[in-house]
A protein has these predicted regions:
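Beta-strand-rich domains and repeat architectures in extracellular enzymes and scaffolds
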Residues: 76-111, 320, 432-441
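Short, conserved, GDST-rich strand-edge loop motifs in beta-rich repeat architectures
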Residues: 190-211, 258-319, 362-390
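A short helix->beta-strand "capping" segment at the edge of beta-propeller domains
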Residues: 53-88, 120, 231, 335-337, ...
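Blade-loop segments of beta-propeller domains
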Residues: 119-140, 148, 174-176
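Periplasmic c-type cytochrome electron-transfer domains
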Residues: 163, 180, 248, 256-263, ...
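Asp-box/WD-like beta-propeller blade repeats and closely related beta-sheet repeat scaffolds
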Residues: 162-181, 190-195, 200-215, 228-248, ...
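Bacterial Sec-dependent N-terminal signal peptides
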Residues: 17-68
Length: 914
């Protein structure tokens, strides 16, 4: 009997591998991996299926990732886009503890491992959406996967042949999922309150004060329909910025939802709102008076105050409740919002509930952006050097509402002089960017992944609750770089850790705090991306005290939605060599080191944007020859940030030129996502179209149209900037590099301008808005500057240009990432969406929109196809099929899933071909 089963399984896998073109897989080793994982090795896919799996995985399949994919961006150039989506819940254990589900984000794949003692054996892989960041088990035969870039959730069935049964379209950039309710039959999914799949969304909501930007999609998992959205019970909007983490109470009756970048009750006053001089030093080291700039203030519970406690409350036109974590009644007929908790942290990563007492624990960082200046602090008396943000775990007691933040690095002497190092024994206690967390079964230990420290810390729960936590390196477990996902078995003796930088899963012996085995995952990323990633996150490398990194502000390569006053009073003015827009006045002859507040800019999409920083003070003039070619201006400019490792992060010395080159190679690959405000067919509404016409053609300034400065030439890679400097008008005293405009929709949420005569606007969800310092609350207020000459009626034309800018073109078209699952008898709305995907994929001018990939697993056989220009489908393994022939493969329970992937990536993804 067993021999017959083995032969049957071998035959199935032979068919699968023949159709799928074979390939590499996840290797097994006994030691932790380095930051760059070794080449993956083929899985032992022909070993017998464990009888204990019963009807599950009877026909394991290998669709993607560590099982069959072989090509990378090195062997198939230009076949990968690096989105740097942050993992949220990348691991899930099956309810019987026998399987581990792993999201392989760069491979767009769910990987299923059998737990065999202290090792992991790959038994199946299922192709899901783009950038899967979370997975949760709904039942023994079903898991749901959250696809961050596809704005979707893949419902994966495991009975018989693992396959995607449904694709649920949800809001923009979903991040987390849990199943709650007394029977755990309701799915809760966090996403941004925007996007073309969000019912009722229009760009008008982006200019409406007091509108929440966070959605929780709620489903009865047993009552899905075949519409695009799958018939959610409700979509609950939270009064916060976009959400990330979810957690459930021990009885399943409450779901906790956390805002991601929730802020910290800081805001910035416009320079025109300052009726007294700013406190502190106002000259450079060479004695030049600083330009007039704004001021960051923080609400202390009673008033808005600056660093010397001046009260600026009369200048702030709104309140910031700073609501971070929300409780949701998961059992109500229509789930409702309950208690809210403030003061949890600035950037909230993950949450877990203690199984012993029901307390909620939240990993977070607390930004210190109200502290002025970088550098030594000698002339300025203050500096954030080495202490940009505190890594914390915050304890919430639901019964009382008590919120107790616990700083994890209280052992560090942050007053050490610039260039000094702390003893190795002290540095080894540091933990940076805590993300995933999981409790021991008895609730006495909280295992916390320190993404920036390559460690998992076993924190005593009682010490966190009491606030008496004492850092102790003996409680740390060294793991591969970038730990971001944790799961623990029922007995509490084995911990499973997913590390994003190393792209590996390890099995940890909890008692000995040692790694027992390592499973390397396949990644299609280039060696340059894999090797350079650590320089963004690695706090041990980046800072002398091991607590901060570039990712402390540039969270997952993006931004933190805060402003910082990172001038350096110890420095002198420097000559501004940058090129200016023709006819623009040139008033900033020299860059002043006291630049004033500036909002964090994204690291995504930097190629082709010219000098860096808001002022362009990373000029890129010293361009080197690298690998036989003169580097780009942007590459040279990025390397000028090396000094920040010392002056800002607090490292003893800059990193080496080779390390900075590796960091640069990685950073230049980071990409912007599609704009979710734009219609999926890339069309414009009547208002957006009118705004585009004004933007491109009307002389809104004396220098010309908006496009004259903010150049929009998608075919040339220009999305709002031509890389030149310009005079900004009389209200701004410094000249600035013209910035790109692709992410304006992410900056909405502050209403109330400190420098106008308007009244108080009420509670808002964020304290920073538009312009270089975030002081302008809305684009409409930005366009009210006297430098702009809008045609009458000005209110209407400003509104039109605002609508267009919020729907601005991006590198990738709106359809990229979008999916639909089709089965015979599909509804009209499914057919319509599939027709849209096909039409967009066959649009080649003025530039290619996307590649359309089709995937199915039917009776144990994997089918993977790429749409051709003539409408036929190229099949993985060879041959062509007509559209009718491809659809003829699908059945009601074994459907086809179609995905629009970035142009140029389809051959690698669908066919494993360059």
């Amino acid at each position: 009997m067993l021999a017959s089963l083995c032969r049957a399984v071998a035959i199935i896998f032979s068919i699968v591998l023949l159709v799928s073109c074979g390939g590499g897989g996840g290797g097994q080793s006994s030691v932790p991996t380095a930051a760059t994982p070794p080449a993956a090795t083929p899985p032992t896919s022909q070993s017998p299926i464990d009888a204990s799996l019963g009807t599950l995985l009877q026909r394991p399949v290998m669709q993607c990732g560590s099982s069959v994919d072989t090509l990378t961006a090195d062997t198939a150039p230009n076949s990968l886009v690096v989105f740097e989506s942050g993992p949220v819940r990348p691991l899930a254990l099956s309810s019987d503890g026998q399987r581990l589900y792993v999201t392989n984000a760069p491979a767009n794949c769910l990987e299923i491992y059998d737990i065999e003692g202290d090792t992991l054996r790959l038994v199946s892989t299922v192709s899901v959406g783009l950038e899967p960041v979370a997975v949760a088990e709904r039942a023994a035969n079903e898991v749901w996967v959250v696809n961050h870039l596809s704005d979707s959730v893949s419902v994966v069935r495991l009975d018989g042949t693992p396959r995607v049964l449904r694709t649920l379209q949800v809001g923009d950039e979903p991040r987390d999922i849990v199943f709650a309710g007394t029977s755990r039959d309701r799915a809760f999914i966090s996403s941004a309150n925007r996007g073309q799949n969000r019912p009722g969304f229009t760009s008008a909501s982006l200019v409406t004060p007091g509108t929440g930007r966070a959605d929780i999609w709620i489903y009865d998992a047993a009552q899905l329909d075949d519409s695009l959205n799958g018939k959610p019970l409700s979509v609950l909007t939270l009064p916060s910025d976009v959400p990330r983490a979810l957690a459930i109470s021990n009885d399943g009756r409450t779901v906790y939802a956390a805002s991601f970048m929730s802020g910290n009750r800081t805001t910035v006053l416009h320079r025109d709102a300052l009726n007294i001089p700013k406190p502190g030093i106002s000259t450079s080291a060479d004695g030049v008076q600083a330009p007039a700039t704004g001021l960051i203030v923080r609400f202390d519970g009673t008033a808005w105050r600056d660093e010397v406690r001046n009260d600026w409350s009369s200048r702030v036109k709104f309140t910031l409740p700073d609501e971070d974590v929300f409780a949701i009644d998961a059992t109500a007929a229509t789930p409702t919002l309950g208690s809210r908790h403030s003061g949890v942290g600035t950037t909230l990563f993950n949450m877990a509930v203690n199984p012993a007492d029901g307390r909620l624990f939240v990993t977070n960082t607390e930004a210190l952006n109200e502290v002025r200046f970088e550098g030594s602090g000698q002339r300025g008396n203050t500096t954030v050097r080495g202490r940009i943000a505190e890594s914390r775990v915050t304890v919430i007691t639901p019964a009382s509402g008590a919120v107790t933040p616990v700083h994890l690095n209280r052992h560090v002497n942050f007053a050490l002089p610039q260039g000094a190092s702390i003893p190795a024994a002290e540095k080894s206690k540091s933990l940076s960017q805590p993300t995933a967390l999981v409790f021991s079964p008895n609730g006495e230990t909280l295992y916390t992944a320190a993404f920036g420290s390559s460690k998992v810390a076993a924190l005593p729960t009682s010490a966190l609750v009491s606030g008496n936590y004492a850092p102790d390196s003996s409680r740390h477990i060294d793991v591969p770089a970038g730990p971001a996902g944790l799961a623990i078995n029922a007995s509490g003796n084995r911990l499973f850790v997913y590390s994003r930088i190393a792209h590996a899963v390890v099995v940890v012996d909890v008692a000995n705090r040692s790694v027992l085995s390592t499973r390397n995952l396949f990644s299609p990323e280039s060696a340059a991306v894999r090797e350079g990633r650590r320089f963004l996150y690695d706090a041990t490398l980046s800072s002398a005290n091991g607590t901060v990194s570039c990712a402390s502000c540039h969270v997952f390569g993006d931004l933190d939605h805060l402003a910082w006053d990172l001038g350096n009073p110890d420095e002198r003015t420097e000559l501004n060599p940058n090129a200016y827009l023709p006819l623009s006045p040139r008033t900033t002859i020299r860059f002043h080191p006291l630049k004033g507040p500036m909002t964090t800019q994204t690291l995504r999409g930097m190629r082709g944007n010219g000098p860096m920083h808001w002022r362009g003070d990373r000029t890129g003039t010293a361009r080197a020859v690298v690998r036989g070619q003169t580097e780009s201006l942007e590459e040279a400019a990025f390397k000028e940030f090396n000094g920040a490792f010392v002056g800002l992060l607090g490292r003893e010395t800059p990193i080496s030129p080779a390390q900075m080159q590796a960091f640069t190679d990685f950073a230049m690959q980071l990409a912007m996502p599609p704009n979710p405000v734009r219609a999926l067919d890339n069309s414009l509404t009547t208002e957006e179209a009118a705004g585009r016409d004004l933007y491109m053609n009307f002389p809104i300034t004396l220098l010309g149209s908006c496009d004259n400065c903010h150049r929009l030439r998608p075919n040339n890679g220009q999305f709002g900037t031509n890389g030149l400097m310009t005079f900004e008008g009389g209200r701004i005293t410094e000249n600035f590099k013209i910035p790109q405009l692709r992410n304006m929709y992410t900056k909405v949420g502050m209403f109330g301008f400190s420098a106008d005569g308007g009244g108080v606007t009420g509670a808002q969800i964020r304290g920073f808005g538009f312009s270089h310092d975030g002081a302008l609350d809305t684009l409409d207020n930005f366009f009210r500057d006297p430098v702009f000459l809008f045609p009458p009626p000005a209110a209407e034309t400003r509104r039109q240009v605002t609508a267009f800018v919020l729907a601005f073109d991006s590198d990738l078209f709106p359809i990229v990432g979008q999916q639909v699952t089709w089965r015979p008898g599909a509804s009209d709305v499914i057919e319509s969406r599939l027709a849209l995907l096909r039409t967009q994929a066959q649009t080649l001018t003025p530039r290619r929109v996307c590649d359309l990939v089709a995937r199915a697993t039917v009776n144990g056989t994997v089918f993977s196809a790429l749409l051709q220009s003539d409408g036929s489908w190229a099949m993985r393994g060879g041959g062509l099929r007509s559209d009718a022939e491809l659809r003829g493969l699908a059945t009601v329970t074994q459907p086809l899933t179609f995905t629009c992937v970035p142009p140029g990536t389809g051959r690698r993804i669908a066919l494993d071909q360059a």
